[in-house]
Amino acid sequence: IAVTTVLKPDADSLRRAREKAEDLRITFYEREKNLFHMSEKYGKEGFLIYGKEPVFFWSKEGTYRFHLGTAVLRIFEMRKGHGDRLCNLLPGDCTSVLDCTFGQRRDSVILSWYLRKRGEVISLERSRPLYEVGKEGLAALSGQDGEMTEALRRIQLLHADFRGFLETAAPNSFDVIYFDPMFRYPVKRKENSMEGFRSAAVYDPLTEDVLQFAMRAARKKVIVKERPFSALFRTGLFTEIHGKRGQTTAYGVIKL
């Protein structure tokens, strides 16, 4: 990837873009009118684009910006007293969650809002574009109210891959360790607005040995969100599978 700016950037946007390119040791290009032509001209798969708004990622497949998406609706439902499928699986005394797959950020936001100040959420993201977009989004975006904004700010986002992180994590480091690798098998829809995200994602496999690392680093539970037919759920490690007929996702739980 490379770094560029929006069309007609102000001085601050130009400065930020140049500094980020230098920091990441990747190339900065002066913005040209057509990003498709820039991609072909310079042989780049995508660009981190800086402007007055938080950085976003562009690729030929689409554009990815940080936004809260369905997290807002899920929190709205919880405020009305309805349960959330993921949060319902957390132990009642949970004070720390490691989200190994930050990705589209929704679950990290939900978990941080649910735990509030009594707990912490640390999230991992290996993809450099998704990490940069996520880091700025968490710091800059404001929610509909103070609680939502505080939930965003409390998330600690690290640029790391989950295998390497878990291999070196101390035993019993987190109450819960969570994985959501399901975007490898997207739910089929007539329109898919997530191609920009998918083009930036890193598709690290969630394997049985990674789950063993997670079981060592977790104190109470390991939770995996996957498609119901996932081979992971047939490894014999999971003590519970939560899913209903007609749902496109299921949660596997390893109780420790």
Language-model segments: which ranges?
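Hydrophobic beta-strand segment of the Class I
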Residues: V97, I177-Y178
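Residues at the starts of beta-strands that form the adenosine-phosphate
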Residues: S96, E120, R154, K220-K221
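Mobile active-site "lid"/loop adjacent to the S-adenosyl-L-methionine
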Residues: P181-V210, S230
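Conserved Class I SAM-dependent methyltransferase catalytic core
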Residues: T207-I254
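Conserved class I S-adenosyl-L-methionine
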Residues: C94-G103, I122
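Conserved SAM-binding loop of SAM-dependent methyltransferases across substrates and taxa
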Residues: Q104-R118
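S-adenosyl-L-methionine
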Residues: I1-S96, V109, L124-V176
